[in-house]
Amino acid sequence: MRVIDAHTHIFPDKIADKATIATAEYFDMPEPPNHHGKVQELLDVLAEAGIEYAMVFSAATSEHQVEHINRYIFKEAQAHPQFIPCGTMHADYAANQDFKAELAWMRQNGLHGLKIHPEFQHFVLDDERMFPVYEEMEKNDMFLISHTGDPRVNVSGPERMYRVATAFPRLRCIATHLGNWGDWDMGKIRPITELPNIYVDISSSFSYVEDKGPLMDILHAYDPKHIFFGSDYPIWCPKKELEKTLRLGIEPGLLEDILFHNFAAFYHYRAL
């Protein structure tokens, strides 16, 4: 069985512990993370779990971090072919810097998507300063992956993802955490499940709830070819998240697609 982890974070060793702890505290983890967000640790965990590839990223919390993070991710992906690199962007960078040049650099260096995390970046997912970025991405077959949902603040909910995805219908958008982290309400999520350019990952979802039934209903509401496995490393352990996914009772053909084939087809920039 082949597996791609479509949702992992990595950090330079000197800040990895601090970044991981801050993230875990923000999201009220039901159990403390056992990992630290360091490159070698992720490589070791992937090997132990039998996971072939991991998409890696880190969100820029200021405009000044954008280029540094993108080059860091590029460097680590060059060194480790197991890594699928994904860049980042910030609304302040989009407003003040030459974002088109940065997106071109990303594409030329194998970073075909960008990750945003509005809660930590202090702008909303549908911030109109980001619309020129989304337009440029749409023109150049880049994809967006965004943290989606937080019941405590309204900066990345499914209604904001819906606005972006409908404004840019050829921009492929990955809504993380089944589309609305911490508020898995079908009524709120259903509108994005009906959009052809919406994809979703299952990271940081099933591990937060005892009753898996409502989340399984949400999973089955999405296009079955648009669902990806993701662990949210280092918040969760890829090996344990894979084991939990295998125990959900997902139909074998769909399970194989979620674990590997769907993302392999989505990520057409290189053979996986």
Residue ranges of each PLM-predicted region?
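Active-site environment of divalent metal-dependent phosphoester hydrolases
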Residues: 11-14, 61-64, 92-95, 121, ...
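Alpha-helical scaffolding within the catalytic cores
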Residues: 37-42, 67-74, 97-101, 157-161, ...
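Well-formed, non-transmembrane alpha-helical positions, independent of function
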Residues: 45-48, 105, 163, 191, ...
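Conserved, mostly hydrophobic/aromatic
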Residues: 7, 46, 73, 106, ...
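Catalytic pocket-lining loop regions of alpha/beta-barrel enzymes
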Residues: 112-113, 123-228
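Active-site gating/metal-coordination segments in enzymes
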Residues: 52-53, 61-145, 150-151, 194, ...
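Mid-to-C-terminal alpha-helical segments outside catalytic/metal-binding sites
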Residues: 1-9, 13-53, 223-226, 235-272
